[in-house]
């Protein structure tokens, strides 16, 4: 008789666990926005007279079987950001148990973005990680300096309009 009373609780717990497991692949997790030119208390701290900054966003769908070099080089790029001239901050996001990854970096100006894109660390990451890319979207836009960072909802709305680049056919 004692077991008959615990069975409904076990079933309810099992159902809750299954429901949670079914939802997790749709969940996204992001890092807090941080960087050498940003304070969560005061906003952008990098000295500049311009009222706008440049936001660069990448959204990648990855081949899980070829993902290890992509992830390793992404870490190296993140570690290099603090030393990049004009870098304000960044956030990363990924889908739990999924194959999607996003990056948002914010820069003083276009010249700083271009210098970063030409950096040896970024160029090596592109070469090493490209094999894992299935599809990607890239977006670059100006953003008010006093409103950094944009929300991920704002970023998603802009990415919605961006074209896909299909790497499976390259």
Residue ranges of model-derived segments:
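Short S/T/G/P-rich N-terminal loop/turn motif that feeds into the first structured element of a domain
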Residues: 8-9, 20-100, 114, 140-170
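Generic detector of short alpha-helix boundary/capping microenvironments
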Residues: 15, 46-47, 136
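An amphipathic, aromatic/His-enriched active-site/gating alpha helix that lines ligand/cofactor pockets
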Residues: 28-33, 110-138
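Short hydrophobic/aromatic beta-strand micro-patches
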Residues: 59, 104-107
